Amino acid sequence: MLYFNMVNSLVLIICLIGFSFPQIQYDGNPQFFDNSYLDIDYIQIDQNNIIDREFHPMVFQFGHEYDVNIDFIKEATLIKEDDKSIYLLGIESSGAYAIGINFNEFYLSQNSKLFFYDEEKSFYIGSFDHRNNKPTQSLTTSLIKSDRIIIELSIPSYELNEIKLNIDTIIHDYTDINNYFTTLNSNREDCNINVICDEGDDWRDQIDGVIRVQMGGGLCSASIINNTANDRTPYVLFADHCVMGGASGYVFYFNYQSNTCNGTSGSLNQSISGSSVLAQEDLNSGPDFALLQITSDIPDSYNPFYVGWS
C-alpha cells in the first residue's frame, strides 16, 4: 500500500508487496510460452553462495541474493528454426516465492527478443530488446512468481556474436511479498491511510512523485525531484541508509498504489531498472541522503511528478 503522513506534510509511500511486470517493455510473445512441455534443464541455485547484505533496520528486506556466474548462451538449450535460434534456460531456487535476475553483462542485438516466465506459464515479462541496452551493460528484472523460471531468447542466427548475457545474481523472495499484507501482517499498518483515499486529495502531485525502490532483496521509498533547469532529468532523492549494493541494479516502481481506499496491494506494471549514485551523506555525519540518477528517461505514460521547482 501507499501511505502519507499529514503531520510532516510529506507524502510517504510504504513500498510493500506485489509482483511486477518488467521494466520498460516492448512488443512480442515468447515462442514457447504455450508449449505444455519443455524438455530443458534447470540450473539449481547453490544457496550456500548467499551474498551477505547487512541492510539497515529501516529497510524492508524481503529476499536473499545468491552469487552465481551463468553464461546464458553457454548453459541454455538451443532450438534452431530456419535462420532463427531460440535459447531456453531454466533456473530453480528451491523454496522461493519469486525469483529476480541480475545481469552483469546485458547486451541484445537489433532483432533479438528476451522473455522471462514461470514454469507454470501463468504469465511472462517482456519482450526486452536492444532498446533496453544501457551503457553499464547491466539489467535487473522484476520478480517472477515461482521457484522455477524459464528465460527465452529469440535471435537471428547471424546476430549471435553480438549478444552478451551473463547472470551474476539471483534474488530469492523468501517472504512471499505478494501476500505479505494478509491478516497476519496487516495489523501493523492499520493506523495508515491509502493515498487513494480522500485524505490524499491535496497531495496528488506529490503522490505521483513518490516511488518504490528495490535494491536486490530490500525495499525503500524515494522521490523524483526536479532541478532549476526544469529539464526532467530523472534525479531521485533517496535515503543513504537504503543504499546497498550496486545502484545499477536498482529497480524503480512508479504509481504503486491501491485502486481502493481499503486495498492491500498496488500495481507494479510501471518500472525502470538501473541508476547511479551522484552524491550521498550518511546518517551519522549528515542528513542521511543520497542523490541518484536513473539511467533511462521516465516515460510520459508513467505520469511522473518532479517534486520541487514544478
Region roles according to the model:
Residues 1-6:
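N-terminal secretory signal peptides that target proteins for export/translocation
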Residues 108-122:
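Short, surface-exposed beta-strand/strand-loop-strand elements in extracellular ectodomains
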Residues 7-22:
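Sec-dependent N-terminal signal peptides
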Residues 93-100:
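Extended extracellular/luminal ectodomain segments enriched in beta-structured repeat modules
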Residues 122-148, 155-159:
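Beta-sandwich interaction modules
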Residues 222:
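Phosphate-binding active sites in nucleotide-utilizing proteins
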Residues 23-93, 172-191, 195-197:
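A short aromatic-anchored loop/beta-hairpin motif
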Residues 144-219, 227-310:
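Serine endopeptidase catalytic core focused on the charge-relay Asp
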